[in-house]
Amino acid sequence: MGVKMLLIFGLLILAMVAKSVNATYPLTKSCINGQGCIGEDDELESLMDSETNRRQLARGRRYIGYDALKKNNVPCSRRGRSYYDCKKRRRNNPYRRGCSAITHCYRYAR
């Protein structure tokens, strides 16, 4: 019972201290000449919709396809096909592929 009262008393003190603190000073930027500051474009980021964000991602990085950025889209819905060869007619067999580090069968022999 004493631990509960101590916890409640501590939370009450914490709430009173938080209420009494007056933080009216502005937050300053800690960067050189105001360039590259963290959070300098927070207003613009909150105004952008999701389509704008997707277009910026598609434009900036070349290894993400635009189809991957579309909403509710599976790159290849055909079973057994890889994402890279989805439109080809032949079926990919994952057990007949070559051995490499990415397929976790590659052994690092010294």
From Swiss-Prot:
GO MF terms, alphabetically ordered: hormone activity
Main subcellular localisation: secreted
Propeptide residues according to the Swiss-Prot or TrEMBL record: 24-58
Stretch forming the signal peptide: 1-23
A biological process term (GO) from this entry: cell-cell signaling
Residues annotated as site: Required for proteolytic cleavage: R54, R55
UniProt family annotation: Belongs to the plant rapid alkalinization factor (RALF) family.
Annotated PANTHER family: PROTEIN RALF-LIKE 4, RAPID ALKALINIZATION FACTOR-LIKE
Annotated function: Cell signaling peptide that may regulate plant stress, growth, and development. Mediates a rapid alkalinization of extracellular space by mediating a transient increase in the cytoplasmic Ca(2+) concentration leading to a calcium-dependent signaling events through a cell surface receptor and a concomitant activation of some intracellular mitogen-activated protein kinases.
Protein name: Protein RALF-like 4
